Amino acid sequence: MPDLTSVVQEIAEEMRERPDRGEVATYIPELARADPKAFGLVVIDADGQVAAAGDSDVPFSIQSISKVFTLTLALGMVGDRLWRRVGREPSGSPFNSIVQLEYERGIPRNPFINAGAIAVTDLILSRHQPREALGEILRFMQFLAQDSSIAIDEAVAASELRTGFRNAALANFMKAHGVIDNPVEYTLGVYFHHCAIAMTCRQLAEAGRFLAHSGRNPSTGHLVVQPERARRINAVMLTCGHYDGSGEFAFRVGLPGKSGVGGGILAVAPGRASIAVWSPGLDASGNSHLGRIALERLTKRLGWSIFGQ
């Protein structure tokens, strides 16, 4: 197999030279400040070897990638009862669409679109006060990444609170259908803040390692979830992790993954590696343009697609 570090560095160099970088998100004003030329890539293999290139130690707003971890946390709290509140099917619609909620009586299609993640956040909140719920989410991320310095970018959270009218509409619609239990402003406050967690590619790849190794971090030995649950989270990431671009990502990359409008992608090569990439420019579906291309290059070079070489 090609040397992992060399492959990662070659891909990063190619991405740095590409003129087609996508468009930085502007609907959350604070995200519009991101450097469109930034690019980072980290791969952590089963032995704990880290291959990093580019801006791999620059923190960025993980946004919807946090939904992987809130789903994991909520499943640990309520188990499969969670699936009564949220589905497991791709949406085929933009991540902040309200149309399907109207047709499907307030039940979100999956936990990775905004409505679904708000419903999952509400389940976590039901056991806590808002500050406690947010603290539990943040501590879980710090535990997984083995890094207590991970924090919430308060400027991003405030920016989302000021402009999150569509998310408020989603939450209120679900509240009207009995899907949301807590006060809408509490649920949205926790949701906006966990989406505003800032991490580096290195921290994010470390946090995702349990999904690549049957629910266990192979370096620490910590069992985060049972193997069956890890497989199922990966399955939802594969089919729903990139909004209405999920099919394209599966077709081109062939790995479970979750994107965020901050330009990050967490990808999982089962049994092999956890991967994090960051490039702020987005495609039409709200996914990192160069991030997806870089992951496609990586899986082709290493033969890591779950569908075969």
Swiss-Prot record:
<feature type="binding site">
    <location>
        <position position="114"/>
    </location>
    <ligand>
        <name>substrate</name>
    </ligand>
</feature>
<dbReference type="InterPro" id="IPR015868">
    <property type="entry name" value="Glutaminase"/>
</dbReference>
<feature type="binding site">
    <location>
        <position position="191"/>
    </location>
    <ligand>
        <name>substrate</name>
    </ligand>
</feature>
<feature type="binding site">
    <location>
        <position position="243"/>
    </location>
    <ligand>
        <name>substrate</name>
    </ligand>
</feature>
<feature type="binding site">
    <location>
        <position position="160"/>
    </location>
    <ligand>
        <name>substrate</name>
    </ligand>
</feature>
<dbReference type="GO" id="GO:0006543">
    <property type="term" value="P:glutamine catabolic process"/>
</dbReference>
<dbReference type="Pfam" id="PF04960">
    <property type="entry name" value="Glutaminase"/>
</dbReference>
<feature type="binding site">
    <location>
        <position position="167"/>
    </location>
    <ligand>
        <name>substrate</name>
    </ligand>
</feature>
<dbReference type="InterPro" id="IPR012338">
    <property type="entry name" value="Beta-lactam/transpept-like"/>
</dbReference>
<keyword id="KW-0378">Hydrolase</keyword>
<comment type="similarity">
    <text>Belongs to the glutaminase family.</text>
</comment>
<protein>
    <recommendedName>
        <fullName>Glutaminase</fullName>
        <ecNumber>3.5.1.2</ecNumber>
    </recommendedName>
</protein>
<feature type="binding site">
    <location>
        <position position="64"/>
    </location>
    <ligand>
        <name>substrate</name>
    </ligand>
</feature>
<feature type="binding site">
    <location>
        <position position="261"/>
    </location>
    <ligand>
        <name>substrate</name>
    </ligand>
</feature>
<dbReference type="GO" id="GO:0006537">
    <property type="term" value="P:glutamate biosynthetic process"/>
</dbReference>
<comment type="subunit">
    <text>Homotetramer.</text>
</comment>
<dbReference type="GO" id="GO:0004359">
    <property type="term" value="F:glutaminase activity"/>
</dbReference>
